[in-house]
Each structure stands twice: as structure tokens, then as C-alpha cells.
Regions:
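A short acidic, Gly/Pro-enriched loop at the edge of an enzyme's catalytic core
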Residues: 109-118
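Substrate-binding/catalytic lobe of Class I Rossmann-like enzymes that use SAM or dcSAM, i.e.
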Residues: 154-264, 271-272
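Conserved Class I S-adenosyl-L-methionine-dependent methyltransferase catalytic core
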Residues: 1-48
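Conserved SAM-binding strand-loop segment of SAM-dependent methyltransferases
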Residues: 98-108
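A short glycine-rich, Lys/Arg-flanked "PGG" loop and its adjoining helix->strand segment in the class I
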Residues: 133-145
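Conserved SAM-binding loop of SAM-dependent methyltransferases across substrates and taxa
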Residues: 64-75
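Conserved beta-strand signature within the Rossmann-like core of class I S-adenosyl-L-methionine
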Residues: 146-153
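Conserved class I S-adenosyl-L-methionine
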Residues: 54-61
């Protein structure tokens, strides 16, 4: 999948995505454009794992480095990001230069070192059901005893061992959408679930914004990719938007702590407090009405 999908030209993704190169579900409030909604998502993720200066953060599946760069610059963290895409690796290395970020080209199972926080956004869809347990154990091995792990990704409503054949063939080879049940089962005896949020309704407007950007930018890429690719890519974006609107797909954001860790009790307590001015963004989440954005 790294070669087939994520190694498409970086300028193509730059044209479709927001300035922070976020290729995952945004978090919309009324009046947000794509860029604002993706910034809201970045802050929300950083606050969910209680980032603060000097913490070491591992970003599993860091993409083009947007979250890693944001966490280092706005939360003062030391970040290691990993990706299996050579295009993403080269781009992220350049883009994160000057920030306290190290980008590595490696499989998540090869990660070394210990981190105060681990995040994995939009990557678990590429793990596969046979490897969910390994994925959880790898995150646990990489996490400090009092750390937090955030796993966020697209989930189906049923536990399956296959994926949509069209998506498998043309868009994401070897991909598989987990269910929430599968992920939490894989974490049994490894992690404690501290919090779960479903932000899936926000993916419909995210995908529609990408499709709009894609259509606007298409004249620049028509000669390079051709009409067949244009039809395929629009079908991918719009069919996925329809699946989220129909609630066939969801996006679960799960915060885990290690079994026996004392940090879990304070996670729930601190949800009632505002530890920094940046968490003001969270107050608006309760007022979000993502489904109304379709009207």
C-alpha cells in the first residue's frame, strides 16, 4: 500500500489535502473549512493524550509528518514518526527540518525505544486482523509504564476478515477495516480502555472537501494520470463519503493506558478541567453538528 497509494506524487496530495497534510478524518464545527477542521483535529488528538513539553511521542504511521511537526512545534514534544512510504519519508524529513522531529522509514514492528505517548492515526486499517494483537503489543512495548496510547482509525460495524474488493484492488491493497470489538479484544491483557469517541460523521464532509479540491486541481494532473484515474479517484472519495453518511463506517478514537498504571484515574478527572488554553478547542466539540454540514 505504501508503493501503490501513498507513493503517489506528493504534489498531488498537497493539492487535495489541507496545509497540514492530514489524510484522515477532520473534526468540524460550524463554519469550519477543511484547514480549520484539521487543525481542530490535531489539537484534539494532542489534548486527548495530554501532551506537554519534554514528553517523547511516537507517531506510528506519521504520513507526511503533519501531526509530528504540529506536536513538536505547538506542544514542545520530542517526536519520532515512522512510515513505510518512501515518498512520505522524504517529504516529512524536509518538512520537519528545524523541529524536534525524527522521521524513520520502517515497519511499526521494528520500532525501538520507549516513549511517554504513542499515537497511531489512520494506520490500523493497514494492519490486518491477524496482526492486531502484535500491533497492540508493539505499542505497549514502546510505551512508558505511565504513558497513553491513542489508536484512531476507520472501523466497520462488523468483525470481518475481508475488505471491499474494489478498494482492495484499486485503492488500498492489503487493507482491512477492523471493528471496535476486534481492537478492544486485541488489547485485552495489554491495555485498559480509558476513553472511546466516535467522530465518524465528520468523515463525510472531510471526503467531500477532498473531492472538491481534487476536481479543482485536476487540470494540473490530467496528462499525468489520465481519465481512468480521475473516474476511479472520484468514485473512491464519493463512495466512501456515502458509506460514512449511511453510518456503515465510523472512526473510533481510543485512548489506552497500560494495565496497572496509575495514570488512568487522572485521565477521567482531567476531562473536567482545562489544563491549558489550547483545550478551549475541545469546548466547541460538544457543539459540533457534523451531520448538518451535509444539508
Amino acid at each position: 500500500v505504501g508503493r501503490v497509494h501513498y507513493d503517489l506524487s506528493t504534489d498531488f496530495f498537497e493539492a487535495m489535502l489541507d496545509p497540514n497534510m492530514q489524510y484522515s478524518c477532520a473534526l468540524f464545527a460550524e463554519g469550519d473549512d477543511l484547514g480549520s477542521a484539521q487543525l481542530r483535529k490535531l489539537d484534539w488528538i494532542c489534548e486527548r493524550v495530554r501532551l506537554r513539553p519534554s514528553l517523547r511521542l511516537l507517531d506510528i504511521g506519521c504520513g507526511w509528518g503533519g501531526l509530528a511537526r504540529y506536536a513538536a512545534r505547538h506542544y514542545g514534544c520530542q517526536v519520532v514518526g515512522i512510515t513505510i512510504s518512501r515518498e512520505q519519508f522524504r517529504y516529512a524529513q524536509r518538512w520537519c527540518r528545524g523541529s524536534d522531529v525524527e522521521i524513520q522509514l520502517r515497519d511499526y514492528r521494528e520500532v525501538t525505544g520507549r516513549f511517554d505517548r504513542v499515537v497511531s492515526v489512520g494506520m490500523v486499517e493497514h494492519v490486518g486482523y491477524k496482526n492486531y494483537r502484535t500491533y497492540m503489543r508493539t505499542a505497549a512495548r514502546s510505551l512508558a509504564e505511565d504513558g497513553l496510547f491513542l489508536c484512531q482509525g476507520i472501523c466497520g460495524n462488523f468483525s470481518r476478515v475481508h475488505t471491499d474488493p474494489w478498494i482492495e484492488r484499486y485503492i488500498f491493497p492489503n487493507s482491512m477495516l477492523p471493528s471496535l470489538a476486534r481492537l478492544t479484544r486485541a488489547a485485552e491483557g495489554v491495555f485498559i480502555v480509558e476513553d472511546v469517541k466516535n467522530i465518524g460523521p465528520n468523515y463525510d464532509p472531510t471526503l467531500l472537501a477532498w473531492e472538491k479540491n481534487f476536481r479543482s486541481a485536476w487540470p494540473r494532473f490530467a496528462d499525468r494520470y489520465g481519465e481512468r484515474f480521475r473516474r476511479m479517484w472520484r468514485f473512491y472519495l464519493l463512495s466512501c463519503a456515502g458509506a460514512f453518511r449511511a453510518r456503515s463506517l465510523n472512526v473510533f478514537s481510543i485512548v489506552f493506558s497500560k494495565e496497572g498504571s496509575a495514570i488512568g484515574s487522572s485521565v477521567r478527572d482531567e476531562r473536567q478541567a482545562v489544563p491549558s488554553s489550547r483545550t478551549a478547542v475541545l469546548e466547541s466539540i460538544g457543539n459540533c453538528a457534523p451531520c448538518e454540514l451535509h444539508r
